């Protein structure tokens, strides 16, 4: 048999543990899972072939690295929940004929679908839909992907499905896409890129959680729709665990704790999605910003400030407009005294402003890297149904930095940015972190700025940095920004939820668009490379997640009130004031409770306020020049002098422990 023939009949598959196996040409992901083990084949949801998530029945037609996706895989829940949204739409279509469907994505905790229906859904309908979803699961309906021309898809959704929403997407959003994919599930079908579950039997448990109003394509001037949220699992046990987590999450809800602990407020008079920081919340935010500022200073960053608005031409040049136009506030139009019209945007990104700072003077290769940093407020017109306190807001502040470097400095700078982000998360108690290399989709190159060669180089650099830092990561094809690949940090909180927070992103595109340059050692102009970097992501979202992660029990260095001084009787008032003043002079945040209340009530109220330490002072302590120390949730810590207390607390604050 010739070498050529062998290469056509066999493929070499590399598994995640590095093992290589040979399989017949055209072997599917399911075949590979079955060859590894019966249990893996039963649990398999999809397959990742050379970094791209695909349906489990996808054939392997070349040598490839392979990952079998189960529910616990980094991509597993997203794929499962996306398929569950299709099963929900299928159930609704059977129960409420004539319903039509808008968007139906997986989200951080479950899925939703936007529905156009003459039926007004109520909470009582949710149980019927859940029951029908489980029934569809029991039918074990095969899910089939069909690829067809855009025109054939338009004909299908016009005549067979009678779905004007998908026709609009095909004629508008996908007008330049020659081939599209449809997923069929019995009588149900939808326009979708996938991947999806191989059949509906994987769904064993479901809970529909909420109904809200929405609009087609998020545009309030378009048709109103109804959005149903839900979550689903491959077992009842997992659903029960999730519901228990939901109860715990309600106790930790940052909106509830934010009000109880007086951290922030939301005011309809101010506007939806525009949180206001109260004094105690401002302390938490200021401490976090100061922490990052100092760490950045040590690492060579320099601060800048930029305006809250910018000329629309700036964002057209960067591509943020019209690329993000659907999530931006409408342009502000200004006419000067001469009748000349200018348009401005509320700043959707800090990046273009920083690029203008870089380009404001001639740069030498010796000047690089230049690391600009700003806590810059940006604005996004998020849909009202998606707003969620601090975690999803319309106005928020990014800890935004841009590093301008030479190509030979790039990998080192990416490594430094990764190191800083890991340090920030470790300091704040996020120990369970997944890292995703978010790459572009080469089959949809038109979605991205820059050439194929530029993207290949950028992704090579990102992989090299991740490998050098010895971090475990998974890849997400199609998850890149339009101007570059990125490293996304996904943290798991105290009750197991995942949150995407920090990011490090490589950008070869913006230097071209903004004609950025430096003079090299050869005396000629060269393009720098940009790294976009934000460990927190946004201050609002990060603090919202931190509140829920800690349950409002902030570490001492972050707590708005660090110590409550609680005198037992009025006779020790003067000594209590001395203790308060001594701790305050040492830079600690102290409250003195002089009310004529029983000490038990004072302690209970301090516990409810989640104040880390309580200093109890009675006549015995005052006479001895001591205090009795209590720790929140831990109780009595013993007696000590004020000086010993000051040293103990100062060490804990400085260590950020």
From Swiss-Prot:
It is found in: Cytoplasm. One of its GO terms (cellular component) is cytoplasm. It comes from the Bacteria. Its main location: cytoplasm. Disulfide bonds: none annotated. Its EC number is 6.1.1.3. One of its GO terms (molecular function) is ATP binding. Zn(2+) binds at residues 351, 402, 532. CDD domains: TGS_ThrRS (cd01667), ThrRS_anticodon (cd00860), ThrRS_core (cd00771). Residues 7-70 form the TGS domain. Homodimer. This is Threonine--tRNA ligase. It comes from Prosthecochloris aestuarii (strain DSM 271 / SK 413). The lineage of its organism: Bacteria, Pseudomonadati, Chlorobiota, Chlorobiia, Chlorobiales.
């Amino acid at each position: 048999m010739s070498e050529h023939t062998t290469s056509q009949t066999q493929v070499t598959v590399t598994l995640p543990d590095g093992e290589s196996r040979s399989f017949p040409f055209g072997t599917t992901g399911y075949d590979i899972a079955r060859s590894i083990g019966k249990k893996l084949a039963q649990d398999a949801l999809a397959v990742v072939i050379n970094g791209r998530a695909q349906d489990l029945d996808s054939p392997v037609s070349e040598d490839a690295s392979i990952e079998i996706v189960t529910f616990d895989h980094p991509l597993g829940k997203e794929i499962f929940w996306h398929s569950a949204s299709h099963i929900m739409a299928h159930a609704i279509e059977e129960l409420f004929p004539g319903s039509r469907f808008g968007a139906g994505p997986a989200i951080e905790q479950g899925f939703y679908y936007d529905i156009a229906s003459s039926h007004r859904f109520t909470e009582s309908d949710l149980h019927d839909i859940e029951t029908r979803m489980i029934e569809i699961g029991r039918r074990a309906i095969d899910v089939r992907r069909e690829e067809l021309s855009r025109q054939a898809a338009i004909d299908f959704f016009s005549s067979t499905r009678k779905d004007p929403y998908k026709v609009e997407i095909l004629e508008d959003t996908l007008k330049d896409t020659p081939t599209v994919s449809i997923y069929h599930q019995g009588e149900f079908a939808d326009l979708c890129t996938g991947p999806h579950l191989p059949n509906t039997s994987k769904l064993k448990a479901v809970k529909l959680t909420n109904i809200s109003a929405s609009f087609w394509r998020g545009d309030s001037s378009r048709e109103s729709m109804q959005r149903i949220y839900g979550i689903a699992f491959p077992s009842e046990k997992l659903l029960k665990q999730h519901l228990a987590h939901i109860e715990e999450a309600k106790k930790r809800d940052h909106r509830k704790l934010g009000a109880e602990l007086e951290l922030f407020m939301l005011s309809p008079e101010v506007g939806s999605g525009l949180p206001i920081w109260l004094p105690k919340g401002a302390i938490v935010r200021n401490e976090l910003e100061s922490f990052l500022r100092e760490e950045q200073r040590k690492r060579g960053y320099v601060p800048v400030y930029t305006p809250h608005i910018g000329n629309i031409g700036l964002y057209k040049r960067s591509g943020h407009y019209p690329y993000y136009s659907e999530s931006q506030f409408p342009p502000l139009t200004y006419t000067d005294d001469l009748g000349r019209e200018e348009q401005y945007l509320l700043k959707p990104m800090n990046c273009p402003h920083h690029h203008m700072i870089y380009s404001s003077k001639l740069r030498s290769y010796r000047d690089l890297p230049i690391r600009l940093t700003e806590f810059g407020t940006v604005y996004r017109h998020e849909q009202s149904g998606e707003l969620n306190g601090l975690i999803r807001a319309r106005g928020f502040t990014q800890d935004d930095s841009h590093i301008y470097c030479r190509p030979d400095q790039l990998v080192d700078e990416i490594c430094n940015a990764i190191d800083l982000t890991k340090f920030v998360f470790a300091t704040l108690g996020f120990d369970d972190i997944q890292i995703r290399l978010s790459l572009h989709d080469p089959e949809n190159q038109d979605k991205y700025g820059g050439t194929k060669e530029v993207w290949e180089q950028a992704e090579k650099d990102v992989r090299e940095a991740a490998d050098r830092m010895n971090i475990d990561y998974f890849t997400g094809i199609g998850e890149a920004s339009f101007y570059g690949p990125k490293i996304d940090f996904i943290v798991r909180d105290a009750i197991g939820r995942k949150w995407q927070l920090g990011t490090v992103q490589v950008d070869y595109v913006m230097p071209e668009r903004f004609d950025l340059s430096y003079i090299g050692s050869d005396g000629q102009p060269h393009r720098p490379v940009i790294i976009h970097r934000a460990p927190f992501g946004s201050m609002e979202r990060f603090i919202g997640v931190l509140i829920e992660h800690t349950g409002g029990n902030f570490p001492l260095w972050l707590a708005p009130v660090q110590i409550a001084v609680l005198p037992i009787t009025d006779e020790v008032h003067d000594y209590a004031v001395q203790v308060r003043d001594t701790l305050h002079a040492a830079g600690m945040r102290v409250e003195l409770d002089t009310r004529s209340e029983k000490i038990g009530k004072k302690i209970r109220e301090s516990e409810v306020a989640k104040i880390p330490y309580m200093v109890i002072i009675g006549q015995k302590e005052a006479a001895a020049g001591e205090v009795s120390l209590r720790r929140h949730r831990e109780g009595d810590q013993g007696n000590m002098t004020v000086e010993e207390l000051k040293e103990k607390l100062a060490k804990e604050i400085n260590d950020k422990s």
